[in-house]
């Protein structure tokens, strides 16, 4: 799957006569970074605008067993001490175009009402919030976890559609479940999770914007300036995404577009969808590895007590349930992936059809110009490519006839009425 992703974007790096085909006016730049050295010093602030079409869902696991749970023989139980098994739950998300975005950076979020807040996670763990003008937002509550670590902020800087204060949180937990009025940023996987009320507001208003920083690009990553509005944090240059059609004059007052831009053929989310598939597969493999670990521990002497064996047996039972859920989710991911891949294939087919249409127009223009050239060549031949002696003879003959006609006419005019009376 990873090779498929690499191969897909590599096609966007093709060049003709030393100029890259899919990068608009920047024909000297490839679509992807060709090496880690090329990507080393790249640092962009990227702005992505979303509509309801970008909303998707993901499956998270509840009561799932971690490696620490296994090593500590921690069996999942409810408040009454009853063993509970892993389960799944669906959460709403907006998937960013990139994973591994900068965690200690600024996330500028604009909701459907135009409310803008810049949430900065500082290196010391604190979180600061500023408005669109850069002023500190008042009335913000800082949230912490059980260990006192800051997890997010709550305030009235966004709309959830019902007037409630919205919480913006940061997490690295891939199984995090947001509250109804919560926006959760997972910079590691490049996701913005939306609580139920926030999701409904985004879906109804059809508008949401996220601005984020990314500085850890690597070989094979797509250049963001080809897809989004960006600011180069190294040079300060601002890139505004717009159509960069290269046109040639092929006839009088007739131009033809000769290039295809990357976003017209190569969907940047192809790679993210591949990431979802690999994640689903890896999750199954990880659970199988955990099950093998538990089975191995059950054979060890130090876990031979009845209590330890009971705990390991309960954990193994939970992992078995977790494995069934993971395999089911993997199947659904691949079923969904088939439809997504068909959509990407259709996008490429449409781009190819557009190129074919332009080739047809060019051929028609060429045929028409060739016909016009033939007609003008024929006319030129009829007017210029003739026998000079024959022309002189014809001209002299015509001149004699003309002069004779003039002479006869003059004699008739010289006669008067008196010449006929007598």
Please give the residue ranges for each predicted region.
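Intrinsically disordered, low-complexity segments enriched in polar/charged residues with Gly/Pro
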Residues: 169-172, 233-235, 348, 386-387
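Amphipathic alpha-helical polymerization modules
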Residues: 1-33, 317, 321-422
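Polar, low-complexity export/assembly segments characteristic of proteins
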Residues: 37-52, 182-347, 351-354, 373
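Amphipathic alpha-helical coiled-coil/heptad-repeat segments
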Residues: 1-124, 132, 193-195, 218-271, ...
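Short, positively charged
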Residues: 156-166, 221-229, 380
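Extended, beta-strand-rich, solvent-exposed assembly scaffolds of outer structural proteins
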Residues: 72, 78-214
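Generic serine detector
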Residues: 7, 35, 56-57, 66, ...
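Short, small/polar residue-rich loop motifs at catalytic or cofactor-binding pockets
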Residues: 178-179, 242, 394
